[in-house]
């Protein structure tokens, strides 16, 4: 069977959207000598992973239709070596594959929504449903690893399903395309590509800073798309007004539509993210483990994803059961780093602010129920989140000896076991303290 014959069969058998987005990129390479393994190649790792997880049975079915065989399907990443001449030809004659390929797992369904990202999510869904109608441009900003790219690509995936033409690039790719087109005197191709789409998605727009010639080109691209009521969505790590080296006319245009921020997730959202990511990756975690990860890690979703990969790899490669001690061992160094960065005065300030008392009250001789409770929480969190010894804590809080510290830690542990409200207060404060290091 040739690639052409295979594509003819699978186009008839597959959903048309799946065929256009993923399956038509398959290149049939060979079948093993015993006819048991059929090997295909594709030039994008996300597409390869998606096809492996979703379409191997369908591909097998195509072989059954063709000759009655049912080989095992292997999907490999293409590593063909091409001459510089061939690469240049592809770049000038074809649409950039990188600019249109989206990670198929980045959808609205797989995005965990919480108070920290609700507005950005709602706005993204609105523009994906009706591109160019409202919130144009949509400017999503926030810290690294909080889900901006996920939302951006979810807009693209959703818009494609509705029949729109979508271009997705990082601003670096846009700049590289622009430079390449000038060098090869092919600006017509460049402008047709970026100005004729229904939806333009630009990641990390802040890196346009200081690039005067590219800013000029992007200004005209923006105007043409906006005037034609085509949707523009951008992400950045800061507001347009805060991007140094960006011309004022672009700053003002970036704020024509809606700016929506993605904030650090709260504890509940972080727990939901861990639950969702572990479910999608087939990792079974107990509530105890999920809470441990949520309260001890920084807030980057990428870091959470990395930890889940490590847990899964350790469990499968070492044939280990996923238990709390196992996860604690894996995260030991990351938690150690957290402890080195958290300072005792910061804990006092955050607890006092949360419980509406003065920081000085916690270090005072006051024994009211509110102050005593706040002091107990501080002592517990200092032991949990720092390397301070009990004598150090007693000295800092002006207490006579460390036996009172030990008593408060014991009491806090008892309350965590019995009182759900106290436990939630502790978890929320722990999360706030870790967040404060950002």
Swiss-Prot record:
Binding residues annotated for ATP, in chain numbering: 145, 147-149
Signal peptide, first to last residue: none
Region (Domain IV, binds dsDNA): 316-438
Region (Domain III, AAA+ region) location: 101-315
A Pfam cross-reference name: DnaA_N
GO molecular function: ATP binding; ATP hydrolysis activity; DNA replication origin binding; lipid binding
Database matches in HAMAP family: DnaA_bact
Similarity section: Belongs to the DnaA family.
Free-text note regarding domains: Domain I is involved in oligomerization and binding regulators, domain II is flexibile and of varying length in different bacteria, domain III forms the AAA+ region, while domain IV binds dsDNA.
Protein name in the entry: Chromosomal replication initiator protein DnaA
Lineage of the species this protein comes from: Bacteria, Pseudomonadati, Campylobacterota, Epsilonproteobacteria, Campylobacterales
């Amino acid at each position: 069977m040739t690639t052409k014959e295979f594509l003819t069969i699978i186009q008839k058998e597959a959903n048309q959207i799946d065929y256009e987005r993923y399956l038509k990129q398959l290149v049939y390479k060979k079948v093993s000598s015993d006819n048991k393994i059929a090997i295909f190649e594709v030039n994008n790792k996300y597409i390869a992973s998606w096809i492996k997880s979703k379409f191997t049975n369908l591909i097998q079915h195509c072989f059954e239709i063709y000759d009655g065989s049912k080989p095992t399907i292997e999907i490999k990443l293409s590593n063909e070596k091409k001459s510089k001449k061939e690469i240049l030809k592809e770049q000038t004659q074809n649409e950039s594959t990188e600019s249109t390929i989206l990670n198929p797992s980045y959808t609205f369904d797989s995005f965990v929504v919480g108070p920290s990202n609700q507005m950005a999510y709602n706005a993204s869904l609105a523009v994906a449903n009706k591109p160019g109608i409202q919130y144009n441009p949509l400017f999503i900003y926030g810290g690294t690893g909080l889900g901006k790219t996920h939302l951006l690509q979810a807009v693209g995936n959703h818009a494609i399903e509705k029949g729109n033409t979508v271009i997705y690039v990082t601003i670096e790719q846009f700049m590289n395309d622009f430079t390449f087109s000038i060098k090869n005197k092919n600006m017509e191709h460049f402008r047709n590509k970026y100005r004729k789409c229904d939806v333009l998605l630009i990641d990390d727009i802040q890196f346009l800073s200081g690039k005067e010639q590219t800013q000029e080109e992007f200004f005209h691209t923006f105007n043409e798309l906006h005037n034609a009521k085509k949707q523009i969505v951008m992400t950045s790590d800061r507001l347009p007004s805060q991007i140094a080296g960006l011309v004022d006319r672009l700053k003002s245009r970036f704020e024509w539509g809606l700016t929506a921020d993605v904030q650090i997730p709260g504890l509940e959202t972080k727990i939901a993210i861990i639950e969702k990511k572990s479910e999608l990756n087939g990792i079974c975690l107990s509530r105890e483990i999920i809470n441990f990860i949520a309260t001890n890690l920084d807030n980057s979703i990428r870091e959470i994803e990395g930890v889940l990969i490590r847990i899964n790899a350790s469990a499968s490669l070492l044939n280990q059961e996923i238990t709390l001690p196992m996860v604690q061992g894996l995260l030991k160094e990351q938690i150690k780093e957290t402890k080195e960065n958290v300072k005792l005065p910061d804990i006092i300030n955050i607890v006092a602010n949360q419980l509406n008392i003065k920081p000085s009250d916690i270090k005072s001789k006051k024994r009211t129920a509110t102050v005593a409770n706040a002091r107990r929480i501080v002592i517990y969190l200092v032991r949990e989140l720092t390397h301070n010894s009990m004598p150090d804590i007693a000295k800092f809080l002006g207490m006579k000896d460390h036996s009172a510290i030990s008593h408060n830690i014991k009491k806090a542990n008892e309350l965590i076991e019995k009182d759900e409200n106290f436990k939630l207060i502790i978890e929320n404060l722990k999360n706030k303290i870790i967040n404060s290091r950002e």
